[in-house]
Amino acid sequence: AIGTARNLAKNMGVGWSLLDYYLVYATQMLYISEYGHPNAQTQIGRGFVDDNSAAINTGGTLINGNNTFGETTGKKQMSYRGIEDWWGNVFDWIDGLFCDSRRNILIGNKGFNNAGQGYENIGNGGSSDVSGNIRHIQSYDKAGFIIKSSGGSYDNDGLYDAGYLDAGYWPRLGAGWSAGSGGGPFQLYGDYSASGSKASLGV
């Protein structure tokens, strides 16, 4: 559940929190500025995404410090500038982003809660739920790389990553241990209830 994850982060100490959407967006922009291509699985590495049956412990890339690391088997963790498992292994809950029942995209950077209360409505995400390879992104300046429409394949076009935007749901970022080519820095699944819990989310 996102509330449980939020509290666990706070319990780490003063200043700790879940990733919020604007921080995610900033990191995505840093990546695309540095590499100039959205297919991060070819630019950096697959991540822990291919035919794995369960999560593995974090820390697999500590030996690399803050250096970026990746490889091609899909059996090892990746790291981008010290951010381990930016995609692959388990998803991350993301705070400060919510798609309401009318598919309005609500974004906030403080006062995080389970209903999007007090968040800014930046625009409507569309007339129906959407999922698949991110072919087009929302046109609103603050929406970042949130999916607008899908098409093509994860290996050949668009953002090369999977996206979901479903009414009334919260986002999870990054891809799980068997996501395959749909994993990457832009994979954002807005398809999970605030009370949802599963192994691929950690809590």
Kindly label every feature range from the protein language model.
Residues 52-54, 59, 87, 91, ...:
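Intrinsic disorder/low-complexity detector
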Residues 1-86, 90:
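Short aromatic-cysteine micro-motif
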